[in-house]
Amino acid sequence: GIMSSKVQFNLIKVINIFGIDFYNGAITVKDLIEIMDIAEFKPWESPLKGYQRKNNEQKINQIAERTIKNLDSLEALVDAININIRQKDAEAYIKPLDKNNDRYGGFHTFTYIPSLGKAFLVDGQHRAKGLQAAASKLQNDKKFNELDKLLNTFINISLTLTEDVYKEAYTFYLINQYAKSVSPEGATRLMVEGFENGSVEFQNEVTSHNTKTTID
């Protein structure tokens, strides 16, 4: 659909990596759904514009189901969703809260306007699409209170602004190449122990032995 209006982000400017400023912040599920897009890898394209693997519908539906079941505790959002806006000019719309104190670690506001183009999902495309699918299902089922609750939940995001699609793809590569290969063995053992002690509630994780694929 057409983007309705501007979106206000609350951000902290964190670090500069390979010439790009990285911001952390929060926006609502509603705003994310409205501004996001996916740069899918199409090997025949020249020049290449995308790098994301094809959506895994099963994974998206799993996340949507879990989202609808646990609207008070959205597990899909435990990790930040990374987005990039391919518009260097967007920096003009980011303002330090205190204009005499524009620094790393400082608070900023970003007034996003539709003419800046879409926010491309760098990491978290399945989670973002899962939230979108959950919203559609709640809408179709006329569960408007639940829909409202989901859409107004805040999401933890990591934001970059670069027109350089190669740098955007490199960010994706770094996240996936290094971060995802971590063995969760230690955490899994703690979860099993917590479950056996009755002190935690992730029974579905421990009993399904499906720890890795559920949240991605």
Q: Where do the protein language model's features map onto the residues?
A:
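N-terminal extension/subdomain marker
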Residues: 1-78, 83-101, 108-111, 117
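Glutamine-centric residue-chemistry signal
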Residues: 8, 52, 125, 167-168
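Short, well-ordered amphipathic alpha-helices
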Residues: 64-68, 128-139
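Solvent-exposed loop and beta-edge segments used for protein-protein assembly and interaction
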Residues: 75, 115, 122, 149-151
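Short, flexible loop/turn elements at secondary-structure junctions
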Residues: 85-87, 123-126, 135, 159-163
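Short, conserved acidic/polar surface loops in the N-terminal third of protein domains
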Residues: 92-97, 130-133, 168-170
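Elongated alpha-helical scaffolds
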Residues: 114, 119-130
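Solvent-exposed functional surfaces
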Residues: 118, 133-216
